[in-house]
Design a protein with these regions (language model features):
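ATP-dependent carboxylate activation and anion-phosphoryl transfer catalytic cores
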Residues: 2, 109-168
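ATP-grasp fold ATP-binding core
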Residues: 3-23, 44-54
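Broad gene-expression machinery/nucleic-acid interaction feature
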Residues: 5-9, 56-58, 136, 149
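Short, small-residue-rich loop/turn micro-motifs
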Residues: 14, 79, 94-96, 153-156
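Short small-residue beta-strand/loop micro-motif enriched in glycine and branched aliphatics
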Residues: 19-20, 101-104, 159-164
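Phosphate-binding site of ATP-dependent enzymes
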Residues: 27-120, 141-148
Length: 168
Protein backbone atom coordinates (compact mmCIF):
# COMPACT_ATOMS: atom_id res chain seq x y z
CA UNK A 1 0.00 0.00 0.00
CA UNK A 2 2.80 2.43 0.81
CA UNK A 3 4.28 1.85 -2.65
CA UNK A 4 1.11 3.30 -4.17
CA UNK A 5 1.83 6.65 -2.50
CA UNK A 6 5.44 7.03 -3.59
CA UNK A 7 6.52 9.54 -6.22
CA UNK A 8 8.80 8.06 -8.85
CA UNK A 9 11.61 7.97 -9.67
CA UNK A 10 12.91 6.50 -6.44
CA UNK A 11 16.41 5.64 -5.38
CA UNK A 12 16.89 2.45 -3.40
CA UNK A 13 20.19 2.16 -1.60
CA UNK A 14 21.96 0.30 1.17
CA UNK A 15 21.93 2.33 4.39
CA UNK A 16 25.59 1.63 5.19
CA UNK A 17 27.69 1.38 2.06
CA UNK A 18 29.95 3.58 0.00
CA UNK A 19 30.90 4.31 -3.59
CA UNK A 20 27.24 4.09 -4.67
CA UNK A 21 27.37 0.29 -4.45
CA UNK A 22 23.93 -1.31 -4.51
CA UNK A 23 22.04 1.85 -5.53
CA UNK A 24 19.29 1.53 -8.11
CA UNK A 25 17.15 4.19 -9.75
CA UNK A 26 13.57 2.91 -9.91
CA UNK A 27 11.15 4.37 -12.44
CA UNK A 28 8.25 1.89 -12.02
CA UNK A 29 6.63 0.20 -9.03
CA UNK A 30 7.17 -3.27 -10.48
CA UNK A 31 10.96 -2.70 -10.44
CA UNK A 32 11.03 -1.89 -6.72
CA UNK A 33 11.41 -5.47 -5.34
CA UNK A 34 14.50 -6.17 -7.48
CA UNK A 35 16.04 -2.86 -6.42
CA UNK A 36 15.45 -3.66 -2.75
CA UNK A 37 17.11 -7.06 -3.21
CA UNK A 38 20.11 -5.45 -4.94
CA UNK A 39 20.52 -3.08 -2.01
CA UNK A 40 20.09 -5.91 0.52
CA UNK A 41 22.92 -7.79 -1.16
CA UNK A 42 25.17 -5.00 0.15
CA UNK A 43 23.45 -4.20 3.48
CA UNK A 44 20.34 -5.66 5.14
CA UNK A 45 19.20 -2.13 6.04
CA UNK A 46 17.78 -0.35 2.98
CA UNK A 47 16.70 3.24 2.28
CA UNK A 48 14.08 4.24 -0.29
CA UNK A 49 14.23 7.90 -1.27
CA UNK A 50 12.30 10.08 -3.67
CA UNK A 51 14.44 11.25 -6.57
CA UNK A 52 15.44 14.92 -6.44
CA UNK A 53 16.33 16.96 -9.49
CA UNK A 54 19.30 19.20 -8.82
CA UNK A 55 22.99 19.78 -9.24
CA UNK A 56 25.25 17.51 -7.19
CA UNK A 57 27.33 19.57 -4.79
CA UNK A 58 29.72 18.24 -2.15
CA UNK A 59 31.21 20.00 0.86
CA UNK A 60 34.23 18.77 2.82
CA UNK A 61 34.22 19.28 6.59
CA UNK A 62 37.13 18.77 8.96
CA UNK A 63 36.49 18.57 12.70
CA UNK A 64 38.29 20.89 15.04
CA UNK A 65 39.89 20.12 18.37
CA UNK A 66 37.88 20.65 21.54
CA UNK A 67 35.54 23.60 21.14
CA UNK A 68 37.00 24.68 17.79
CA UNK A 69 34.37 25.03 15.07
CA UNK A 70 34.65 22.59 12.18
CA UNK A 71 36.47 23.83 9.08
CA UNK A 72 34.43 23.83 5.90
CA UNK A 73 36.04 23.79 2.45
CA UNK A 74 34.79 25.47 -0.70
CA UNK A 75 31.99 23.40 -2.24
CA UNK A 76 32.70 21.25 -5.27
CA UNK A 77 30.26 20.22 -7.98
CA UNK A 78 29.96 16.94 -9.86
CA UNK A 79 29.13 17.59 -13.53
CA UNK A 80 28.32 14.51 -15.60
CA UNK A 81 28.36 14.15 -19.37
CA UNK A 82 26.20 11.32 -20.71
CA UNK A 83 27.88 11.56 -24.11
CA UNK A 84 31.08 10.30 -22.46
CA UNK A 85 29.50 7.37 -20.64
CA UNK A 86 27.98 8.89 -17.49
CA UNK A 87 25.04 6.96 -16.11
CA UNK A 88 21.66 8.37 -15.13
CA UNK A 89 23.07 9.25 -11.71
CA UNK A 90 26.49 9.37 -10.05
CA UNK A 91 26.77 5.59 -9.70
CA UNK A 92 29.76 3.31 -9.18
CA UNK A 93 30.35 2.93 -12.93
CA UNK A 94 30.39 6.70 -13.45
CA UNK A 95 32.54 7.39 -10.37
CA UNK A 96 35.28 4.87 -11.03
CA UNK A 97 35.15 3.67 -14.63
CA UNK A 98 33.86 6.51 -16.81
CA UNK A 99 36.51 9.10 -15.97
CA UNK A 100 35.91 11.19 -19.09
CA UNK A 101 32.23 11.44 -18.20
CA UNK A 102 32.73 13.40 -14.97
CA UNK A 103 34.14 16.82 -14.29
CA UNK A 104 34.83 17.93 -10.72
CA UNK A 105 34.30 21.69 -10.59
CA UNK A 106 35.84 23.35 -7.56
CA UNK A 107 34.76 25.80 -6.45
CA UNK A 108 31.22 24.90 -7.45
CA UNK A 109 29.35 27.36 -9.63
CA UNK A 110 26.95 28.59 -6.98
CA UNK A 111 25.40 31.92 -6.13
CA UNK A 112 26.68 33.55 -2.94
CA UNK A 113 23.46 32.54 -1.18
CA UNK A 114 23.72 28.90 -2.36
CA UNK A 115 27.38 28.77 -1.32
CA UNK A 116 26.63 30.09 2.16
CA UNK A 117 23.67 27.72 2.51
CA UNK A 118 25.57 24.53 1.64
CA UNK A 119 28.61 25.49 3.70
CA UNK A 120 26.61 26.38 6.83
CA UNK A 121 24.35 23.34 6.43
CA UNK A 122 27.39 21.07 6.04
CA UNK A 123 28.83 22.38 9.32
CA UNK A 124 25.46 21.92 11.04
CA UNK A 125 25.14 18.36 9.70
CA UNK A 126 28.65 17.55 10.91
CA UNK A 127 27.83 18.79 14.41
CA UNK A 128 24.40 17.09 14.42
CA UNK A 129 25.93 13.64 13.89
CA UNK A 130 28.71 14.28 16.42
CA UNK A 131 31.25 14.28 13.61
CA UNK A 132 34.94 13.87 14.28
CA UNK A 133 37.79 14.09 11.81
CA UNK A 134 36.71 14.28 8.20
CA UNK A 135 33.28 14.17 6.64
CA UNK A 136 31.78 15.02 3.26
CA UNK A 137 28.23 16.31 3.05
CA UNK A 138 26.54 15.73 -0.32
CA UNK A 139 23.72 17.95 -1.54
CA UNK A 140 21.32 18.44 -4.38
CA UNK A 141 21.00 22.15 -5.16
CA UNK A 142 17.67 22.69 -6.90
CA UNK A 143 16.85 25.25 -9.58
CA UNK A 144 15.09 27.41 -6.99
CA UNK A 145 18.22 27.53 -4.77
CA UNK A 146 17.22 24.98 -2.15
CA UNK A 147 19.94 22.72 -0.78
CA UNK A 148 18.78 19.19 0.02
CA UNK A 149 21.18 16.99 1.99
CA UNK A 150 21.60 13.71 0.13
CA UNK A 151 23.94 12.10 2.64
CA UNK A 152 26.62 12.67 5.24
CA UNK A 153 29.64 10.55 4.37
CA UNK A 154 31.96 9.91 7.34
CA UNK A 155 34.41 7.96 5.19
CA UNK A 156 34.82 10.05 2.02
CA UNK A 157 36.91 8.70 -0.80
CA UNK A 158 40.55 9.64 -1.28
CA UNK A 159 41.14 8.15 -4.71
CA UNK A 160 42.48 10.19 -7.64
CA UNK A 161 38.81 10.47 -8.69
CA UNK A 162 37.46 11.66 -5.32
CA UNK A 163 36.24 15.18 -4.63
CA UNK A 164 37.25 15.51 -0.96
CA UNK A 165 40.98 16.17 -1.52
CA UNK A 166 40.26 18.71 -4.30
CA UNK A 167 38.04 20.87 -2.11
CA UNK A 168 40.87 21.92 0.20
Amino acid sequence: AACEELDYPLFVKPARAGSSLGITKVERREDLPAAVEAARAVDPKVLVETGITGREVEVAVLGGHGDDAPRVAEPGEIVMDASHGAGEFYDYQTKYLAHDAVQMVCPARLTAAERELVMSTAAEAFLAIGGEGLTRVDFFVTDDGRAVVNEVNTMPGFTPFSMYPYMW
